[in-house]
Amino acid sequence: MRIFLDTANIEHIRHGVRLGVVTGVTTNPSLVSREGKVDYQKVVKEICSVVHGPVSTEVLGEDVQTMVAEAREIAKWAENIVVKIPASLEGVEATSVLASENIKVNLTLCFTLNQALLGAAAGATFVSPFVGRLDDIGEDGMKVVTDIVEYLDYYQLPTQVIAASIRHPQHCSTAAKIGAHIATVPYEVLLQMIRHPLTDIGIGRFRDDWKRVMGERGILS
């Protein structure tokens, strides 16, 4: 399973890339605005220059014509752009139009297998079930991800699943176990995935044992 960052923070993206684990980004106008940015296109282009994998960014339009027009323009910003289209009736139709033009689509705000099924049929490159938001209303977000993965696998469809609205590391590990192709995570969750108190304790013990014998001398000293 690949890891994407769900953010518009350039420094967080740079750090994820330096770690060697982040291979894509998902973002939207809300995430860009949280960073105090006003030039949406400039921010997205900068992200695309930092990450060489897919960068999903969202349209604002709600009708088919506007979504398609915005998507065509956004797709020109960089070669690794993927356009996020909402899983609405209009969004599915827009996805079909864009897929016929070889514009990659991430069907976002997906909450059911049926939405993902239609998105895949329309030619979406990715579908993004929102795990945390489903959990928030008492539904089982990971069950929806499981159903979508099983459906796509059974029919050998090329559409990939991005587990989105990830709230904690357990969401990510569960997504990996059930076969999601990608999990897009907030920067804070990425850091939580790496950290464990027993790792910190072990590092401290190794350091203390070394100092007892070798003092302050390092391995390369």
Region spans (language model):
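Active-site beta->alpha loop and helix N-cap motifs at the rims of alpha/beta catalytic domains
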Residues: R2-R14, L19-V22, T26-V97, V131
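C-terminal alpha-helical cap/extension of soluble enzyme domains
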Residues: L152-S221
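Glycine-enriched alpha-helix->loop->beta-strand junction motifs that scaffold or abut catalytic
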Residues: G20-G24, W77-N80, V97-N106, A121-S128, ...
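Glycine-rich phosphate-binding active-site loops on the catalytic face of alpha/beta enzymes
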Residues: P29-V32, L109, T125-I137, G179-T199
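Conserved, mostly hydrophobic/aromatic
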Residues: N28, V83, G119, A175, ...
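Alpha-helix-loop-beta-strand connector modules within alpha/beta enzyme cores
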Residues: Q41-V55, V92-V105, G141-V161, R205-L220
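Histidine/lysine/aspartate-rich catalytic loop segments that bind and position anionic ligands
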Residues: L109-V144, Y151
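Catalytic cores of alpha/beta
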Residues: E11-L19, T66-E70, A94, T112-A122, ...
